[in-house]
A protein has these predicted regions:
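ATPase catalytic-site recognition across NTP-hydrolyzing enzymes
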Residues: 4-67
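Short acidic/glycine-rich loop or secondary-structure boundary segments that cap or lie
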Residues: 36-37, 52, 71-74, 97-100, ...
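Mg2+-dependent endonuclease catalytic cores in nucleic-acid-processing enzymes, primarily RNase H-like
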Residues: 82-202, 223-236, 240-248
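Glycine-rich phosphate-binding/hydrolytic loop that grips phosphoryl groups
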Residues: 158-161, 210-217
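Short beta-strand scaffold segments in enzyme catalytic cores
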Residues: 73-79, 214
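Short, hydrophobic alpha-helical segments
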Residues: 216-224
Protein backbone atom coordinates (compact mmCIF):
# COMPACT_ATOMS: atom_id res chain seq x y z
CA UNK A 1 0.00 0.00 0.00
CA UNK A 2 1.02 3.65 -0.41
CA UNK A 3 3.02 5.18 2.43
CA UNK A 4 0.68 7.71 4.13
CA UNK A 5 3.59 9.93 5.18
CA UNK A 6 4.72 10.26 1.58
CA UNK A 7 1.15 10.95 0.50
CA UNK A 8 0.75 13.60 3.21
CA UNK A 9 3.73 15.73 2.26
CA UNK A 10 3.36 15.40 -1.48
CA UNK A 11 6.58 13.46 -2.06
CA UNK A 12 4.73 10.51 -3.54
CA UNK A 13 2.86 12.65 -6.06
CA UNK A 14 6.07 14.49 -6.93
CA UNK A 15 7.76 11.15 -7.50
CA UNK A 16 4.94 10.02 -9.79
CA UNK A 17 5.11 13.27 -11.76
CA UNK A 18 8.81 12.69 -12.37
CA UNK A 19 8.23 9.30 -14.03
CA UNK A 20 8.44 8.80 -17.81
CA UNK A 21 5.26 9.71 -19.72
CA UNK A 22 3.75 6.23 -19.95
CA UNK A 23 4.37 5.28 -16.31
CA UNK A 24 3.19 8.69 -15.08
CA UNK A 25 -0.07 8.42 -17.00
CA UNK A 26 -0.71 4.92 -15.68
CA UNK A 27 0.15 5.49 -12.02
CA UNK A 28 -0.81 9.14 -11.52
CA UNK A 29 -3.70 9.60 -13.95
CA UNK A 30 -4.98 6.01 -14.08
CA UNK A 31 -4.71 6.14 -17.89
CA UNK A 32 -3.72 2.68 -19.14
CA UNK A 33 -4.50 3.37 -22.81
CA UNK A 34 -1.01 4.61 -23.68
CA UNK A 35 1.27 1.64 -24.38
CA UNK A 36 5.02 1.21 -24.03
CA UNK A 37 6.71 2.31 -27.24
CA UNK A 38 3.67 4.36 -28.22
CA UNK A 39 4.23 6.98 -30.91
CA UNK A 40 2.21 9.57 -28.96
CA UNK A 41 3.00 9.18 -25.24
CA UNK A 42 1.74 12.73 -24.64
CA UNK A 43 -1.82 11.62 -25.46
CA UNK A 44 -4.06 11.65 -22.39
CA UNK A 45 -7.70 10.71 -22.05
CA UNK A 46 -8.00 13.34 -19.33
CA UNK A 47 -6.81 16.15 -21.61
CA UNK A 48 -7.73 15.03 -25.10
CA UNK A 49 -11.05 13.16 -24.79
CA UNK A 50 -14.30 15.00 -24.06
CA UNK A 51 -17.95 14.12 -23.82
CA UNK A 52 -20.38 15.07 -26.57
CA UNK A 53 -21.62 18.64 -26.82
CA UNK A 54 -23.56 20.46 -29.53
CA UNK A 55 -21.10 21.84 -32.07
CA UNK A 56 -21.87 25.52 -32.86
CA UNK A 57 -23.27 25.81 -36.36
CA UNK A 58 -20.76 28.53 -37.30
CA UNK A 59 -17.73 26.30 -36.69
CA UNK A 60 -16.37 25.11 -40.07
CA UNK A 61 -16.54 21.34 -40.56
CA UNK A 62 -13.93 19.05 -42.06
CA UNK A 63 -14.27 15.45 -43.21
CA UNK A 64 -11.33 13.12 -43.84
CA UNK A 65 -11.20 9.47 -44.88
CA UNK A 66 -8.94 6.49 -45.39
CA UNK A 67 -10.59 3.93 -47.67
CA UNK A 68 -10.34 0.16 -47.43
CA UNK A 69 -12.48 -2.83 -48.29
CA UNK A 70 -10.86 -5.89 -46.70
CA UNK A 71 -9.20 -3.50 -44.26
CA UNK A 72 -11.48 -1.00 -42.52
CA UNK A 73 -12.48 2.32 -43.99
CA UNK A 74 -12.35 5.22 -41.56
CA UNK A 75 -14.11 8.55 -41.94
CA UNK A 76 -13.54 11.27 -39.35
CA UNK A 77 -15.51 14.49 -38.93
CA UNK A 78 -14.01 17.51 -37.20
CA UNK A 79 -15.03 21.07 -36.36
CA UNK A 80 -12.71 24.07 -36.17
CA UNK A 81 -13.37 26.53 -33.35
CA UNK A 82 -12.50 30.23 -33.34
CA UNK A 83 -9.08 29.55 -31.81
CA UNK A 84 -8.30 27.16 -34.69
CA UNK A 85 -8.58 24.10 -32.44
CA UNK A 86 -10.01 20.94 -33.96
CA UNK A 87 -12.72 18.87 -32.29
CA UNK A 88 -13.10 15.38 -33.80
CA UNK A 89 -16.76 14.66 -33.12
CA UNK A 90 -17.72 11.65 -35.24
CA UNK A 91 -16.15 8.57 -36.80
CA UNK A 92 -17.34 5.89 -39.19
CA UNK A 93 -15.27 2.70 -39.04
CA UNK A 94 -16.32 -0.32 -41.10
CA UNK A 95 -15.08 -3.14 -43.33
CA UNK A 96 -16.45 -4.53 -46.59
CA UNK A 97 -18.08 -1.34 -47.86
CA UNK A 98 -17.86 -0.54 -51.55
CA UNK A 99 -17.15 3.05 -52.51
CA UNK A 100 -20.87 3.53 -53.25
CA UNK A 101 -21.89 2.05 -49.90
CA UNK A 102 -19.40 4.20 -48.00
CA UNK A 103 -20.66 7.30 -49.82
CA UNK A 104 -24.23 6.43 -48.82
CA UNK A 105 -23.18 6.00 -45.17
CA UNK A 106 -21.45 9.39 -45.25
CA UNK A 107 -24.49 11.13 -46.73
CA UNK A 108 -26.70 9.50 -44.10
CA UNK A 109 -24.39 10.65 -41.29
CA UNK A 110 -24.33 14.23 -42.61
CA UNK A 111 -28.08 14.65 -43.11
CA UNK A 112 -28.43 17.13 -40.24
CA UNK A 113 -24.94 18.66 -40.51
CA UNK A 114 -23.88 21.89 -42.16
CA UNK A 115 -22.01 21.11 -45.37
CA UNK A 116 -18.34 20.42 -44.66
CA UNK A 117 -16.02 23.23 -45.72
CA UNK A 118 -13.09 20.86 -46.26
CA UNK A 119 -13.12 17.25 -47.42
CA UNK A 120 -10.01 15.13 -47.87
CA UNK A 121 -9.55 11.53 -49.01
CA UNK A 122 -6.46 9.35 -49.36
CA UNK A 123 -5.00 10.54 -52.67
CA UNK A 124 -4.41 6.94 -53.80
CA UNK A 125 -8.20 6.69 -54.24
CA UNK A 126 -7.78 8.63 -57.51
CA UNK A 127 -5.63 5.82 -58.94
CA UNK A 128 -7.22 3.67 -61.64
CA UNK A 129 -6.48 -0.01 -62.21
CA UNK A 130 -8.46 -0.32 -65.44
CA UNK A 131 -10.92 1.61 -67.56
CA UNK A 132 -13.53 2.10 -64.84
CA UNK A 133 -13.89 5.04 -62.46
CA UNK A 134 -11.59 5.45 -59.48
CA UNK A 135 -12.82 5.04 -55.90
CA UNK A 136 -12.86 8.82 -55.51
CA UNK A 137 -14.88 9.27 -58.71
CA UNK A 138 -17.46 6.69 -57.61
CA UNK A 139 -18.04 8.50 -54.32
CA UNK A 140 -18.20 11.91 -55.97
CA UNK A 141 -20.83 10.61 -58.39
CA UNK A 142 -22.86 9.69 -55.31
CA UNK A 143 -22.64 13.31 -54.16
CA UNK A 144 -19.75 13.02 -51.69
CA UNK A 145 -17.09 15.49 -52.73
CA UNK A 146 -13.40 15.07 -51.93
CA UNK A 147 -9.97 16.60 -52.45
CA UNK A 148 -6.77 14.50 -52.50
CA UNK A 149 -4.83 14.15 -49.25
CA UNK A 150 -1.29 15.18 -48.49
CA UNK A 151 0.36 11.80 -47.81
CA UNK A 152 3.57 13.08 -46.20
CA UNK A 153 3.87 10.68 -43.28
CA UNK A 154 6.55 12.45 -41.23
CA UNK A 155 5.00 15.91 -41.47
CA UNK A 156 1.58 14.42 -40.73
CA UNK A 157 2.88 12.77 -37.57
CA UNK A 158 4.54 16.01 -36.48
CA UNK A 159 1.28 17.90 -37.00
CA UNK A 160 -0.48 15.43 -34.68
CA UNK A 161 2.22 16.06 -32.04
CA UNK A 162 1.72 19.82 -32.47
CA UNK A 163 -2.04 19.51 -32.07
CA UNK A 164 -1.76 17.29 -28.98
CA UNK A 165 0.54 19.83 -27.31
CA UNK A 166 -0.88 22.69 -25.24
CA UNK A 167 -1.35 26.07 -26.85
CA UNK A 168 1.05 28.45 -25.03
CA UNK A 169 -1.72 30.97 -24.31
CA UNK A 170 -4.77 28.87 -23.56
CA UNK A 171 -2.78 26.04 -21.96
CA UNK A 172 -5.22 23.68 -23.66
CA UNK A 173 -4.51 21.13 -26.41
CA UNK A 174 -5.21 22.13 -30.00
CA UNK A 175 -7.16 18.95 -30.74
CA UNK A 176 -9.73 16.96 -28.78
CA UNK A 177 -11.83 13.90 -29.50
CA UNK A 178 -15.38 13.06 -28.53
CA UNK A 179 -15.45 9.91 -26.41
CA UNK A 180 -17.73 8.27 -29.01
CA UNK A 181 -14.80 8.24 -31.49
CA UNK A 182 -13.42 5.05 -30.01
CA UNK A 183 -11.19 3.85 -32.84
CA UNK A 184 -9.21 7.05 -33.30
CA UNK A 185 -8.78 7.38 -29.54
CA UNK A 186 -7.58 3.78 -29.33
CA UNK A 187 -5.14 4.18 -32.22
CA UNK A 188 -3.64 7.50 -31.11
CA UNK A 189 -3.17 6.05 -27.63
CA UNK A 190 -1.60 2.79 -28.71
CA UNK A 191 -0.07 2.97 -32.18
CA UNK A 192 3.64 2.11 -31.83
CA UNK A 193 6.65 3.77 -33.37
CA UNK A 194 8.24 2.16 -36.39
CA UNK A 195 11.18 -0.07 -35.51
CA UNK A 196 13.07 1.15 -38.58
CA UNK A 197 12.10 4.84 -38.69
CA UNK A 198 11.67 6.69 -35.41
CA UNK A 199 9.96 9.57 -37.26
CA UNK A 200 7.03 7.38 -38.33
CA UNK A 201 4.55 4.95 -36.81
CA UNK A 202 4.55 1.21 -37.37
CA UNK A 203 2.65 0.79 -40.64
CA UNK A 204 1.94 -2.85 -39.78
CA UNK A 205 -0.22 -1.75 -36.85
CA UNK A 206 -3.89 -0.91 -37.29
CA UNK A 207 -3.63 2.65 -38.57
CA UNK A 208 -6.72 3.47 -40.64
CA UNK A 209 -8.15 6.02 -38.18
CA UNK A 210 -4.64 7.39 -37.64
CA UNK A 211 -4.22 7.90 -41.39
CA UNK A 212 -7.59 9.64 -41.67
CA UNK A 213 -6.58 11.98 -38.85
CA UNK A 214 -3.24 12.65 -40.52
CA UNK A 215 -5.00 13.60 -43.75
CA UNK A 216 -7.37 15.87 -41.84
CA UNK A 217 -4.62 17.76 -40.06
CA UNK A 218 -2.50 18.16 -43.20
CA UNK A 219 -5.34 19.83 -45.10
CA UNK A 220 -4.49 23.32 -46.36
CA UNK A 221 -7.49 25.04 -44.83
CA UNK A 222 -8.53 28.43 -46.17
CA UNK A 223 -11.53 30.71 -45.77
CA UNK A 224 -12.72 30.41 -42.19
CA UNK A 225 -9.43 28.87 -41.12
CA UNK A 226 -7.50 31.87 -42.45
CA UNK A 227 -9.76 34.08 -40.34
CA UNK A 228 -8.85 31.90 -37.36
CA UNK A 229 -5.18 32.36 -38.14
CA UNK A 230 -5.62 36.13 -38.33
CA UNK A 231 -7.35 36.08 -34.95
CA UNK A 232 -4.50 33.98 -33.60
CA UNK A 233 -1.96 36.49 -34.90
CA UNK A 234 -3.87 39.31 -33.20
CA UNK A 235 -3.96 37.29 -29.97
CA UNK A 236 -0.23 36.65 -30.20
CA UNK A 237 0.40 40.36 -30.72
CA UNK A 238 -1.75 41.30 -27.72
CA UNK A 239 0.10 38.86 -25.47
CA UNK A 240 3.56 39.80 -26.74
CA UNK A 241 5.50 42.01 -24.35
CA UNK A 242 7.23 44.71 -26.37
CA UNK A 243 9.30 46.21 -23.56
CA UNK A 244 10.70 44.13 -20.72
CA UNK A 245 10.77 47.11 -18.30
CA UNK A 246 7.43 48.80 -18.94
CA UNK A 247 5.54 45.86 -20.50
CA UNK A 248 4.39 47.64 -23.65
Amino acid sequence: TDNPHLMADGQYEAMLRSLPDVERKRLLEGDWDVAEGAAFPEFSRVKHVVEHFDIPTNWPRIRAADYGYSAPSCVLWGAIDWDNNIWVYRELYAKHLTAEQLADRILEAEQLDPLPHYTVLDSSCWNKTGFGPSIAEVMMRQGVRWTPSDRNRVQGKMEIHRRLADDPYSQEPRIRFFSSCQNIVKQIAGIPLSKTNSEDVDTKAEDHAYDALRYMLMTRMSGYASIHQQLGAIKNHVHKVQDEVFGY
